[in-house]
Amino acid sequence: MRCRPNVKQVKARRGGVIKSIHKYREMGVRQSLGTDTFPLDMFNDMRMAATVCRIVEHAVDVAPSHEVFTMATVGGADGLGRPDLGRLAAGCKADIVLVRTDTFKASPVYDPFKFLVLSACGDDVDRVIVDGRTVVQGGVVLNVDMPAAVARLNEAALRVRSRIVL
């Protein structure tokens, strides 16, 4: 069965919504959650997916946080045809994001999935391990000159924008 991508924020910005996570699930449709637009923020996209579904369905239980998290991890990997991603299992890439839960914002943590989906943001990320290598430590991206990268990005955006006819 094909995997249906769910891009809530993009749809909502354009005045539309993808109706319901739980109705697709009940029909046996595998779902993934992803983003392809600014801001590239999976925490925000998980929050948006849960919130939009709850608004559309007028019910809080239709987009459980653990299911939205699964859409963003296992569902995303499955949607890409990558069984080696999105899960912590033997033979899979060791891609791990460690999020701080010892902060005032996160406390008390009754349900880590609810925190990750409904409250967390990039600033809560402490460490990121990609294929077994630490690439973020203490919330800081390692081996990247971020100010220089941002400057190059802004310069490239200006070049592209100058070529666009508005």
PLM feature spans:
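Active-site microenvironment of metallo-dependent hydrolases
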Residues: T73-L166
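Thr-Gly-centered strand-to-loop micro-motif
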Residues: P5-Q9, L33-D36, V99, D131, ...
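Flexible loop/turn segments at secondary-structure boundaries
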Residues: A12-R14, P39-M42, K105-A106, V136
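A conserved active-site cap/scaffold subdomain adjacent to cofactor or substrate pockets
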Residues: M1-Q31
